[in-house]
């Protein structure tokens, strides 16, 4: 974590008044690593938790506006126009979040979507599960995983180093934010539905956590959970 982001995290800590137990633990310095949150099974309900433990997701290059749509709703007083924004955030090293925000103005909807993406951040497993590579570096998924949303189904398959991301543009944005550099993919269903496709990719990444790995698999595929180079923020 760069010095600039450490200073940003300290400013957030100084101004933040936590409203949840987890927030208090972070504020008091009892939790200094985001991996600890997932290990203990806490639910993130305050975006400031991410601003402190994963401040680099606030960098412009670590945020993606995936889709902006205009929604019209008929009410007794006439038509009500609102914006719906789908956004993703990530540290490009094992953590990624996806969120949807609504608002009468596009700027408000974007800010809401980014905040919801922070609340929905997940920790993923990475590694080298490709039989063509076996470099044991965390550049791909360690094994094939599948995600589903609505009629859309996405399967991510380990790829060798240098392959790149063989998936649609929406999938590329989410995978890059998660720190995945090489992957094959198979897609099924109405993949032109941007929101469902994005959620299916996100769900596939989440499902890397559903596979129980053995010490032998960790050694063989170079499996890493979360950051490849763990760092933590402290008040000191």
Curated annotation (Swiss-Prot):
The N-terminal domain interacts with the head of the 30S subunit; the C-terminal domain interacts with the body and contacts protein S4. The interaction surface between S4 and S5 is involved in control of translational fidelity. GO terms for biological process: translation. Keywords: Ribonucleoprotein, Ribosomal protein, RNA-binding, rRNA-binding. Belongs to the universal ribosomal protein uS5 family. Transmembrane segments: none annotated. One of its GO terms (cellular component) is cytosolic small ribosomal subunit. SUPFAM superfamilies: dsRNA-binding domain-like (SSF54768), Ribosomal protein S5 domain 2-like (SSF54211). The keyword ATP-binding does not apply. The keyword S-adenosyl-L-methionine does not apply. Part of the 30S ribosomal subunit. Contacts protein S4. With S4 and S12 plays an important role in translational accuracy. This is Small ribosomal subunit protein uS5.
């Amino acid at each position: 974590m760069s010095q600039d982001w450490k200073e940003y995290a300290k400013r957030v800590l100084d101004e933040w008044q936590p409203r949840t137990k987890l927030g208090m633990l972070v504020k008091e310095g009892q939790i200094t690593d985001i991996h600890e949150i997932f290990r203990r099974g806490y639910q993130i309900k305050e975006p400031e938790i991410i601003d402190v433990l994963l401040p680099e997701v606030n960098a412009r290059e670590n945020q993606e506006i995936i889709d902006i749509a205009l929604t019209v709703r008929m009410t007794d007083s006439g038509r009500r126009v609102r914006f719906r924004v789908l956004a993703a955030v990530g540290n490009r090293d094992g953590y990624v979040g996806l969120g949807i925000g609504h608002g009468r103005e596009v700027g408000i909807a974007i800010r809401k979507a980014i905040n919801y993406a922070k609340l929905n951040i997940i920790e993923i497993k990475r590694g080298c599960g490709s039989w063509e590579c076996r470099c044991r570096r965390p550049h791909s998924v360690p094994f094939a995983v599948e995600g589903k949303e609505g009629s859309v189904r996405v399967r991510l398959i380990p790829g060798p180093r240098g392959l790149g991301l063989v998936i649609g543009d929406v999938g590329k944005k989410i995978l890059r934010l998660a720190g995945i550099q090489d992957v094959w993919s198979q897609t099924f269903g109405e993949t032109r539905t941007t929101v469902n496709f994005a959620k299916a990719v996100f769900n596939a990444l989440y499902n890397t956590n559903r596979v129980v790995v053995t010490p032998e698999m960790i050694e063989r595929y170079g499996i890493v959970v979360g950051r490849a180079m763990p760092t933590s923020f402290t008040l000191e």
